[in-house]
Amino acid sequence: MEIEKLNLYRDTNWNDIKLRFCGHSECLPLHSYGPGTRPYYLMHFVLSGKGRLVVNKTEYQITENQLFLVEPDQMVFYQADKEDPWTYSWVGFNGKLAPYFMHRLGFGYPSLTKELSTEVFEEIKDLLDILISIKNNNTKNDLYTNGILLLLLSKVGTFIEDSKELPERKSRQNSESHVQRAISIVEDFYGRDLTVQYIADKL
């Protein structure tokens, strides 16, 4: 029997970005959705197991510690694996700035999946647990749950941005190291005949 938890949040007047609902599913083998569309963004976080996502005839194999995004009005099909069905949590959200934020995070067909580190995934799981546990709809909780959504997206964005920057940062550090070494050689041999080839050989 599939185990599912669902938390719905009341509609608010916030138009920029707002949390609509969140949930958690321990899926049965081959449990599926679609082909169908959603009227909002739906971000899934795969906690264990695996499955597949099909969008525009492109198939993605999704495993633990990955997330996948369903965009509004996008025809999708996704299905749990037969042998190792996935367990995932999800958040549904919309708002006039939601497309902008998703684009800045690097999402958009065909880039609909991201792999996160175990550490970041654990932090996100804690935030999802909080969202699922909140039951009372009031102004205080409206602020709290929307704040958690923004924090969750921020953690995803920070990890993605850091991952992109690592090769660039490493290259920049190596370049700076070579520059400093070249300066040191020039200073050490100041007043002597130096050639570019000599400096290059010393680096």
State each model region's role.
Residues M1-L67, Q74, K82, L105-S117:
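Generic protein-terminus/edge-of-domain signal
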Residues T12, E26-P29, K50, P72, ...:
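A general structural signal marking secondary-structure boundaries and capping sites
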Residues K18, L42-F45, N94-L97, E123-L127, ...:
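Amphipathic, well-ordered alpha-helical segments in soluble domains
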Residues D73-L97:
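Ligand-binding loop in jelly-roll beta-barrel domains
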Residues Y109-E122, I134-N146, L153-L203:
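Short, Lys/Arg-enriched, Trp-marked, Pro/Gly-tolerant hinge/linker segments that flank
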